[in-house]
Structures are given as structure tokens and as C-alpha cells.
Amino acid sequence: MRKFIRAYFCFSFIVCFLYSSEVVAHTVPPALRELDFSIAINKKSIALGDRWDNDVAHKIKVPTEGQFVGEIPFDGVNYKFYQHHQAELDVFSSNLLWDKNERNVNDYIVSQITINSGECSTPRGIHVGSTIEELNKAYGVGQSENDSGEQWVSYELGIKLLSFKIKDNMVVKISMNYAN
């Protein structure tokens, strides 16, 4: 009888362990990757860090020349930023980190992507209008921050930052940029 009870408890423990491992495997989203800093628009994709040129501007149907927003300091160096706007999104190009990445001062990259409407989504399917539950399921629980009354949930990979503005438990804006 003792052997039966011991075997029963061992079997029960193993089954519970395997079940809990299976549940964890299904509920923990994959770690953030470089691909998470891209969007698909008009069946074309652009990503943070892509070289800014006529082809990229054409993909998202904005002029190559943007509106100058100013020089913004990163690590004590000022970099030039330009905004390229359309209804669904804002893309910022800059010569960010040209000096550290062995590029010419006039070589520009996509340095920020801001999604303003539900037309665009992240590679994990999150878009403006997604719920906080969908966000947590896709990315996990991120770093929550209240900035001047606005709630943001953020995820970092190296110097890249993926942020979601939340209002009434819904995603209302998505931003991908370089952390400063």
C-alpha cells in the first residue's frame, strides 16, 4: 500500500509539473527581437534603423524631405531630426549616431516610428485599438510609466524602445525609437 501511495504522489507531482510547464510555455511571450521594431504598411515594411532614402519614403507615401524638428542631443552630440507625416503615422529621420556607426554626417536613418491609427500594426499584431490584455499577451508585462498624466507601457532591446500609450485600457499610440 505504501508503494502505491508513494507512486501515486510521484505520478501526481510529475503530471502537475508538466502541466504547469505547458501553461507557462503558452503564456510567456517570446523575448523582444529586432523585428519588433518594424511595421508593415501598404504590404511593405520599414524598421527602426533603416537607411532613410527615396525608396523608404515612397513605401510609406511621404516626401523624402521632411519638416526639420531640430537638433536633439544624444550622448552629448547634437543630431538633426526631420518629421515625415501622414495620417496613420509619423516617421522621423535623423543622422543619429552617424559618428559612432561609421556613416557620413549626411546619411540619415529611420530613428522613430509613431503609429497614430489602427491601419498599421506591430509584427505581433498590436495596433491602435488593441486592449491592454492583448498587449500583455503579445509582449508580456512591460515597464509601466505615468508621464504627465499619460500612461505608457514600454519594452527595451539595447538602445531601442518600443512604447504603447494606454488610455481606458486601450492602446491609443505606438512609438518605436532610440532611448536617450
Per-segment meaning from a language model:
Residues 1-9:
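Bacterial N-terminal signal peptides that target proteins for export
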Residues 8-17:
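Gram-negative bacterial Sec-dependent N-terminal signal peptides
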Residues 41-46, 118-126:
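Second-shell loop/turn segments in exported
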